[in-house]
Amino acid sequence: MAGHSKWANIQHRKGRQDEKRGKIWTRLIKEITVAARMGGGDIAANPRLRLAVDKAADANMPKDNVTRAIQRGSGGLEGVNYEEIRYEGYGINGAAILVDCMTDNRVRTVAEVRHAFSKFGGNMGTEGSVAFLFKHCGQFFFAPGTDEDKLMEAALEAGAEDVTTDEEGGIEVICPPHDFSAVKDALAAAGFKAELAEVVMKPATETVFEGDDAVKMQKLLDALENLDDVQEVFTNAVIEQA
């Protein structure tokens, strides 16, 4: 199934993640700690923890950091208790935004998120105001030139729901979140390595931003992503790169 081009945006997203590697480590330590607290420190028995540890490996985080985070979460070491909160809001031209946070101070976090929205042309919404526009799923992206037929066969056999190819040849695979690890392992066993592999909130529809609106929207997203308590930002905005 064909779709519009996402490949440039994926490459841009990867580059931005590389630029923020130090912050990514901090976020992953929080995620590993909370995952271990919620589901235990056994990676084999805790899918959320396994996903976080896999992300840490992809981000070249030292194993000692990962081990300490698991120990803090499972009670082996003292540490901060983080609360998970999701905020919803609107960006430029009403674009939908979800902001996932982990915090030890809810009052501080909501104030910082609200300030970022208002400073850069957005506004906070109420619970449920935009969440219905997104679907929780596993998402994989493969580079142009990947064998689409073989990838599709392996993905669908492993439990993927959808495989789409954009106009540049980049391939997106979508699966239920609980099947993410199984699909990832099956694709790796078949010889496929994803450029990006994440569990995300995927928008049902997208809005393309160009020119000045794209610049304004990117500033808002950057402001939210740069907040210390923010783990993930999801939006239905597609920023066209100049």
Swiss-Prot record:
**Which GO cellular component term is one of those annotated?**
cytosol
Chief subcellular site?
cytoplasm
| Record localization | Cytoplasm
**Entry superkingdom:** Bacteria
InterPro entries given for it?
Answer: Integrase-like_N, TACO1_YebC-like_2nd/3rd_dom, TACO1_YebC_N, Transcrip_reg_TACO1-like, Transcrip_reg_TACO1-like_dom3, YebC-like
Matching Pfam families = TACO1_YebC_N (PF20772), Transcrip_reg (PF01709)
The UniProt GO MF terms for this protein read: DNA binding
Q: Which SUPFAM superfamilies match?
A: YebC-like
Keyword set, alphabetical order: Cytoplasm, DNA-binding, Transcription, Transcription regulation
Q: GO biological process: what's one of them?
A: regulation of DNA-templated transcription
Q: Which protein family is named in the record?
A: Belongs to the TACO1 family.
Q: Indicate what this protein is called per its UniProt record.
A: Probable transcriptional regulatory protein HEAR0561
